[in-house]
From Swiss-Prot:
It comes from Sclerotinia sclerotiorum (strain ATCC 18683 / 1980 / Ss-1). The gene is slx4. This is Structure-specific endonuclease subunit slx4. Keywords: DNA damage, DNA recombination, DNA repair, Nucleus, Phosphoprotein. CDD domains: SAP_SLX4 (cd22999). It comes from the Eukaryota. Residues 96-106, 437-450 have a biased composition (Basic residues).
Length: 922
């Protein structure tokens, strides 16, 4: 029967394959997962041996012993593989076992001994025979039970009895000692009457009998089952489970005494627990393996640096490895085999000893790594000597750039660099923490050498004032800085800045963008609502003058008499200069730019005769007969002269054509002669032609004897010349100017009368520049004869009273005359008068009562609120009683108000925009 049992256990090769997989199951059972109790890993941490190269399964204690003593343990290895199949059979029996089966107790024999009886199962091994084969099988089954205790400590196992040598009893006792986590059943009283310890009643086990006095007992195999659910005695189970790895039998054999003491000595660490199976098997062989295993437990800590086998499968092993620090690893190398201290003491001693050891190693590494740095520093010195092509950016920032040589870094008193010995050329230091004295002694020598190369020195921290001065002396050119800096011309940048500043300097008086379109008023044409358009503004240069046309200032240039021959022979009542004398433009205004100065020349006798013949030419009526339907057909003769001339500058006739009588194609051709673009508006074309004609003929008239600084006298004589030329061109047409022109050409006695008549034409000239009325209606002879309103004499009260135009009041003419009169003799008086006027304006604005309406503040409140001041409105407010209240009886022009605002830095603007219309918003 025993032979049959052996055949059943050793059979079924497929179960051997399954047993290899189940020897270390990857996951615990379902009941363990539900109860929340982790399966303990007996092989983990530092006690785990590395995986052999040719291993196919997980290594165990038997495989390690087999490698150390393969000859003596070969039989045990064969028996080990044979028992594995029996263990698998027992695992299968656990699943089919009934829950209440292990509660049955074994019956007592007649001799007083207790027989171990387990519940009969279908596949378990029954009573064994007492022959040699049965004893061998019992040993194998006992070893299988021990394997179950190692791998699955929570599952119950059957206990075996040994009838032959008593070895099975010792093995069973070791099994009890190695199963701390399993619940056990109550044990009966042995043959001597001693009580055994009561185990956990959760899983009952068969009662044991102590093998003493040679009594043989045959153990029964117990049916293994899965752990049940928690019973009512859960508290007692938990209390018994807390004591792990410390439960031993009260009565142990003499051979196991030393094993129990060893386990108690090392219970603090379960990784160093001895293996009782290996000790029992190897003890009889006499190879000294037990002592080797003891030495192995003491020598285990240095192997903690190796990766364990079950590192990924067991999270507890990972936590135990990660908890060890670097100091612990270093301290393990300083372990002495003669020390008997615990692991904690060895780690602590390793930390204290390892700190000094690591410092020495770091010092050695630093000394060795500093050796190749010295030639590296020499190479950087050679690179610093090389001169590079400096760019503009480098030149500008050289004053602030610090030297980037490695020597400067070594010489700098940085605390961190003082601990590096590569600063010393010799590199000899005692302990690595002392500062070498030689770099400091050599630092001034290196600085002297760098000063010879010409590199920039370290800048000194300057005060704000000196720093601003240094910045102002630097020359920066913004743009592309890829060009190399040229050092041959250091003054090039300064000259460039001076030229740019000179080009940006513009005279505010000549800037057309400073003043509004009513700038003609300040030039002698009164406060005119002139039709300045885009073309007339675009055709002017930076000074506001027409381009490609020689112009003079209309306001500040004295107007000469048109009739140069006759006027040169008559004496002047006001000014009688010599024949070669005239007023220079520079004497009138010294601030005028040289571009607007008129070249002065003297008219010779040949030119006078030519001009006289042109005025008395008989071919003019033929040219003007085509346009006899016009009001002034004689003016077409002047146009014919203009057509004959190649350029407008060659026209010497002082009479301006009547552009109002021209047709649109004729106006277009006239504009093309002045090299202007085509203009669609007829009114704008006429205004542009009038301005061009006046600017064209002024230089020829400015060199005659009639250069009187009084503008009104010059304008009177100019209108007189227009009347004379009209009567000479066409004598057949009855005109009131005909007789007067003959008197002017025949005798000089009628000069006072001509002056009196020219008073009227002076006002006509103002209307030509100020009003929107066509020139044909303004220059009609009926208006000049029928005007009966008296006109106040501005400068010459000796002349007879002439009628004033109906569209101009006395106050307006007085303001125009005050704005137009400028004399170099009265410049200082004008400045003093202007300063006095500014004082009165300031007093009038500040003394005015504040406004009660928040939406209509006073002028002073507007200035304080930084509101833009409308010059025309402020001038009208000052002239309506504000100035008279502060003691100023005269009126003020908007231009003077503008100058006062600019002197006080007040934001001001004109009511009229650049297009000639009123501003819609401010």
């Amino acid at each position: 029967m025993a032979t049959t049992d052996v055949f059943i256990i050793s059979s079924s090769p497929p179960r051997r394959l399954v047993s290899h997989i189940a020897s270390s199951p990857p996951l615990p059972s379902l009941d363990k997962m539900v109860n929340g109790k982790k399966a303990s890993n007996l092989r983990q941490g530092s006690s785990v041996a590395p995986i052999p190269t040719g291993a196919t399964i997980f290594a165990s204690a038997s495989t390690l012993l087999r490698e150390s003593s393969s000859g003596s343990l070969q039989g045990f290895d064969n028996a080990r593989s044979f028992v594995t199949s029996a263990v698998q059979d027992e695992n299968d029996l656990k699943k089919s076992a009934k829950p209440k089966a292990p509660r049955k107790t074994a019956p007592k024999k007649e001799d007083g001994t207790v027989e171990k009886v387990a519940k009969a199962s279908r596949k378990t091994v029954k009573k064994k025979d007492k022959d040699v084969s049965g004893d061998f099988v019992d040993e194998l089954v006992g070893e299988a039970a021990e394997i179950i205790a190692e791998k699955k400590p929570r599952k119950p196992r059957a206990k075996k009895g040994d009838n032959a040598e008593g070895k099975s009893g010792s093995v069973a006792e070791a099994t009890v000692e190695k199963k701390p986590r399993k619940s056990r059943a109550k044990k009966a009283v042995d043959a001597t009457g001693e009580d055994l310890k009561e185990k956990v009643p959760r899983k009952s086990r068969a009662k044991k009998t102590d093998v003493e006095a040679g009594i043989e007992t045959v153990p029964k195999e117990k049916a293994v089952r899965k752990p049940r659910a928690k019973n009512s005695d859960l508290d007692s189970n938990l209390q018994s489970k807390m004591v792990k790895g410390r439960v031993t039998k009260s009565a142990v054999n003499a051979s196991n005494t030393h094993k129990v003491e060893t386990s108690k000595a090392d219970t603090g660490n379960k990784h160093f627990a001895p293996n009782p199976i290996v000790e029992d098997i190897v003890a009889d062989e006499g190879f000294g393996l037990v002592e080797a295993i003891r030495r192995r437990t003491n020598w285990t800590p240095p192997k903690s640096t190796k990766v364990p086998i079950d590192l990924e499968d067991s999270p507890e092993a990972q936590e135990s490895d990660t908890s060890k620090g670097f100091a612990e690893l270093l301290g393990s190398f300083g372990y002495s085999s003669y020390q008997a201290d615990s692991i904690e003491k060895r780690i602590s001693s390793g930390v204290s000893n390892g700190a000094a050891a690591t410092r020495k190693r770091k010092l050695i590494e630093m000394v060795t790594t500093n050796i190749p740095r010295e030639p590296g520093s020499k190479t950087t010195k050679e690179k610093a000597v090389k001169k590079k092509a400096r760019t503009l950016t480098d030149l500008a920032t050289s004053a602030y750039a610090t030297a980037e040589d490695d020597d400067n870094l070594l010489d700098a008193p940085t605390p961190l660099l003082q601990y590096f010995p590569h600063a010393a050329p010799e590199g000899s230091t005692n302990n690595g923490f002392k500062i070498p004295p030689k770099p400091r002694s050599k630092s001034p020598m290196k600085r002297v050498q760098k000063s010879k190369t010409g590199s920039a020195e370290e800048p000194i921290l300057l005060s704000p004032e000196s720093a601003m001065k240094q910045v102002s002396n630097q020359d920066f050119v913004f743009g592309t800085s890829s060009q190399l800096a040229r050092e041959d011309s250091p003054s090039l940048l300064r000259d460039l800045h001076d030229a740019m500043q000179a080009s940006n300097e513009l005279d505010d008086y000549d800037d057309p963008f400073v003043s509004p379109p009513t700038k003609i008023a300040e030039r002698g044409k009164a406060v005119v609502a002139a039709k300045r358009n885009l073309w007339s503004i675009a055709a002017r240069d930076n000074h506001g003058d027409l381009m490609d046309v020689e112009t003079i200032d209309l306001a500040h240039t004295p107007v000469a008499k048109p009739d140069r021959i006759m006027l040169s022979q008559k004496p002047s009542s006001l000014v009688t200069p010599g024949k070669d004398d005239w007023f220079d433009i520079d004497e009138i205004e010294d601030n005028r730019p040289p571009s607007t100065q008129v070249p002065l020349r003297e008219t010779g006798p040949i030119e006078r005769s030519i001009n006289f013949q042109l005025l008395d030419s008989p071919t003019q009526p033929k040219n003007t007969s085509k346009d006899s339907s016009k009001v002034f057909p004689q003016k077409k003769g002047t146009k014919s002269l203009v057509d004959k001339s190649t350029t407008p500058k060659k026209v010497d006739a002082s009479k301006m054509p009547d552009y109002e009588s021209f047709t649109t194609p004729q106006l277009t051709r006239e504009i093309q002669k002045y090299k202007f673009k085509q203009i669609k508006s007829r009114k704008r074309m006429i205004d542009l032609l009038i301005q061009c004609y006046e600017s064209q003929n002024r230089p020829a008239l400015g060199v005659l004897q009639g250069n009187i600084p009084i503008i009104t006298q010059n304008s009177l004589e100019k209108s007189k010349d227009v009347a004379d030329s009209s009567t000479q061109v066409k004598p057949t047409i009855p005109s009131p100017r005909r007789g007067r022109a003959k008197k002017v050409t025949t005798s000089t006695a009628s000069l006072p009368k001509s002056k009196a008549k020219s008073k009227m034409t002076d006002t006509v000239a103002f209307l030509e520049m100020d009003s929107d009325t066509p020139l044909s209606k303004i220059r009609t002879p009926q208006k000049s004869r029928k005007g009966k309103q008296p006109l106040e004499d501005i400068f010459d009260s000796d002349h007879p009273i002439t009628p004033s135009p109906p569209r101009r009041s006395d106050s307006q003419i007085r303001k125009i005359s005050k704005a137009l009169e400028l004399s170099p003799d009265n410049n200082q008086d004008d400045e003093a008068q202007q300063a006095q006027l500014f004082t009165h304006i300031y007093t009038a604005i500040t003394k005015a009562p504040p406004s009660q309406d928040p939406f209509n503040p006073s002028w002073h409140e507007k200035i304080l609120l930084y509101d833009p001041i409308i010059l025309e409105d402020l001038a009208s407010w000052l002239n309506t009683g504000a100035l008279s209240k502060v003691g100023w009886d005269e009126e003020v022009a908007p231009l003077e108000v503008k100058k006062w605002c600019e002197s006080k830095s007040i934001c001001c603007l004109w009511k009229e925009n650049q297009g000639g219309g009123a501003r819609s918003r401010y």
